[in-house]
Amino acid sequence: MKHYVVDEPEGMDGFLYDTRNELTNYTYYYQFDPYRETQLEADQVPAIKTFSRSIVKWLEEHGTEENRVIQQYGLSFQKIRHFADELGHVCDAAMEHGYGLSVLGD
């Protein structure tokens, strides 16, 4: 099987944490430890997929806040959208094959 990888851009962790109350299933994503390898079972992958979609929804609903987000986190909406889309794509592949997700920390 092809390897699917998503890189979390610098500043994304702060953005996601600060918007966590407006995102669906942030608590599942928060389980990923940025400093060590973390595994999520296959039954948790749909929750991460929903989380990725909630990021896209947040962007669509807060289009006027892009300058603030760029200033505060150094992230354009395009970069955030790319991350969310790639995360969703990895989730789709994992769900299609019944796999969980692995995260490799720094």
Where are these regions (language model features)?
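Acidic (Asp/Glu-rich) sequence patches and key acidic residues
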Residues: 1-106
